[in-house]
Design a protein with these regions (language model features):
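Conserved phosphate-binding catalytic cores of ATP/NTP-utilizing and phosphoryl-transfer enzymes
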Residues: 7-45, 72-89, 99, 108, ...
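C-terminal, non-catalytic interaction/recognition modules in large multi-subunit enzymes and RNPs
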Residues: 42, 52, 60, 97, ...
């Protein structure tokens, strides 16, 4: 099972402490994005997982995600959310996905989500009894989704039911169904772009310095519009099928255990205090190694990491600062204090070097390395003509035009296609806008980069 902090534990441990596995699924996707990027030689990544009811995003600068000791469920710009004091990778989410309901609020504004039709009854076009319009219905009506090839043609889609469901929204907006549908698509793209702003710009990161890794059924459809809005220079749509990318991220995760201890004291620069801090870490390290031993892992194979939760005196919030992993001296406490000042400045825009500091807690992470799975290379044989599925009409910004459609599974390695076009896979559809070109790499990933004409 995946921990919210990004490691793996046995099912028995997860049964005893289920709270530590919250958000384990999408966090596996972030880890998968980190692993994929390391294979491709990437550096800074933002991972977006566009699903059925929610879209989640995480960020890893230098392929290292931040871990927070507090996680807020259902927190957004309008809701305070619910806090959980568990170590969690930095991840944020919104109620947006393929089954998000389309509606008009009391002020006459178009809305997409957070309510959703879910798997049952699902979008109206699925013919499972749903009669309310969803984002998927809008994709079908505006031409982005192929009603004949969803799930490789295994899922029948009824375009007439999508028309019927969207008609009420169109009437309220004084538009036809196609115009209303594209309005829904644009709003969904804007909401997804705002999610990426939350995980990047609001954290002090420039999205122009990152690669966007897009997975899930909706992720590759949001991605080019997000990249255009935020000037992200590269998009990677993983070769791993969208429905199992999180699972792929979980396979090969390091086994991980961690413990925290709250013990508030003023940070002092003297030898006795350094010895005291070291003893607290050693206590936690001993307990962490015992946890590995109970799971059949040789404690001598475990690598430990130390962190201090530090704050300025009089403050409520803390920052997690790495600490020297050995016998502590005054110089190591000074180093931690300097790192705290820098981290505080980056996080909040100011630091107080002359102010007193407090250590609020101690945190030890134990890691047993596991070899991750490798990616297989795909065939270089085949041709673009064999992958062609003809053309389809898109409705965008009030205009209709035809774009080429390609079958993802038939594209040979190394082929490059220019946008606008659509690449249809068995489990996901990748939209390539006119400002991008797409390369099918040696592993079967789709790499989108700006199309400089």
């Amino acid at each position: 099972m995946t921990l919210s902090a990004g490691g793996m534990v046995t099912s028995e441990y997860a049964k005893r402490y289920p709270i530590f596995t919250i958000e384990g699924g999408p966090i596996s996707g972030i880890i998968g994005g980190i692993r994929l990027s390391s294979i491709l030689g990437g550096k800074n990544i933002i991972v977006i997982d566009g699903g059925s009811t929610t879209t989640k995003a995480g960020l890893a600068k230098e392929l290292t995600p931040k871990v927070y000791t507090e996680y807020w469920i259902e927190q957004d710009d309008w809701n305070a959310g619910y806090p959980l004091r568990v170590p969690t990778l930095d991840i944020t989410e919104i109620g947006l996905g393929g089954t998000s309901l389309v509606w008009i609020d009391d002020a006459g504004n178009l809305r997409v989500g957070p309510q959703a039709a879910g798997a049952r009854p699902g979008p109206a076009c699925y013919g499972q009894g749903g009669d309310k319009p969803t984002l998927t219905d809008a994709y079908v009506l505006s031409g982005f989704l192929n009603p004949e090839y969803l799930l490789g043609g295994r899922l029948k889609v009824f375009k007439d039911l999508a028309h019927k469901a969207m008609s009420g929204i169109a009437r309220q907006l004084n538009l036809d169904e196609k115009e209303a549908s594209y309005g829904v698509v644009r709003l969904a793209n804007d909401n997804a772009a705002n999610l990426i702003r939350q995980i990047s710009v609001k954290r002090g990161y420039d999205p122009r310095e990152f690669t966007l890794i897009a997975h899930g059924g909706a992720g590759p459809m949001f991605a080019p519009f997000i990249a255009e809005e935020l000037k992200i220079p590269e998009i990677v749509v993983p070769a791993i099928p969208s429905g199992v990318f999180n699972s792929w991220g979980m396979i090969g995760l390091d086994i991980r255990h961690e413990l925290s201890l709250t013990d508030i004291s003023s940070l002092k620069m003297d030898g006795a205090y350094a010895k005291y801090v070291g003893s607290r870490f050693e206590e936690l390290e001993s307990r962490v190694r015992e946890m590995f031993k109970l799971e059949g892992v040789d404690p001598s194979s475990v690598v430990t990491e130390r962190y201090l939760d530090i704050r300025y005196e009089g403050q409520a919030h803390t920052l997690k600062i790495p600490c020297y992993n050995g016998r502590l001296g005054i110089e190591h406490l000074k180093e931690a204090a300097e790192m705290f000042h820098k981290a505080h400045y980056k996080e909040y825009g100011f630091s107080l070097p002359e102010s007193g500091m407090e250590i609020v807690g101690f945190h030890v992470v134990g890691i047993h390395k596991v070899k991750p799975p490798e990616l297989s290379r795909i065939s270089t044989t085949g041709s673009l003509n064999r992958a062609s599925l003809g053309e389809r009409t898109l409705f965008v910004d009030g205009s209709e035009f035809n774009v080429p459609i390609y079958k993802k599974e038939s594209l040979p390695a190394g082929v490059v296609v220019e946008g606008p076009c659509i690449i249809e896979g068995d489990t996901a559809t990748t939209v390539v806008t006119k400002n991008f070109k797409a390369r099918h790499d040696d592993f079967g990933n789709i790499i989108l980069t700006p199309n400089r004409r």
